[in-house]
């Protein structure tokens, strides 16, 4: 997942190959992004299994469903952060010469947000506190974010205003 726009918030992800997830999103026009934490990493990995069409990934991975407020798609109950999204675009990627590749980009506008309040300090989300997991360049490489690796950079335009 990545953030592509702030106002309105638009997030997206790429799917290598046509998967049920992409098909479901295109058919319903909705999806939920669920934060993967260190605690949920193994279950998240289980959701990538190639299951027979119609088999429930939640059940196979030992995850529970929670109702969303705005979209008609369940969210992962165990995830401390969920973004409810409406599909804005989906497209098959192409090479520079226009030849299609077997990867799909899905973009959605965030229309609802759920954040575990224990991850907020003075109304600001504390990323390291959630112990999020991110994919890191290979099919098996992941990293977890921790407070010890945090650093801040002030943008040049913001420095000029001081």
Give the residues covered by each predicted segment.
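Basic, polyanion-binding surface patches
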Residues: 1-162
């Amino acid at each position: 997942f990545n953030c592509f726009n702030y106002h309105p918030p638009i997030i997206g992800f790429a799917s290598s190959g046509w998967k049920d997830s992409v098909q479901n999103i295109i058919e319903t026009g909705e999806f939920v992004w669920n934060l993967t934490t260190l605690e949920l990493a193994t279950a998240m990995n289980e959701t990538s299994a190639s299951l027979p069409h119609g088999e429930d990934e939640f059940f196979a991975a030992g995850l529970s469903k929670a109702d969303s407020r705005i979209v008609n798609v369940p969210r992962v109950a165990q995830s401390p952060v969920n973004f409810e999204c409406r599909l804005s675009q989906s497209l098959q990627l192409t090479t520079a010469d226009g030849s299609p590749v077997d990867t799909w980009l899905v973009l959605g506008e965030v229309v609802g947000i759920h954040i575990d309040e224990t991850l907020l300090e003075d109304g600001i989300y504390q990323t390291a506190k959630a112990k999020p997991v991110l994919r890191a360049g290979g099919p098996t490489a992941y990293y977890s974010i921790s407070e010890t690796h945090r650093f801040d950079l002030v943008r040049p335009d913001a420095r000029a205003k001081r």
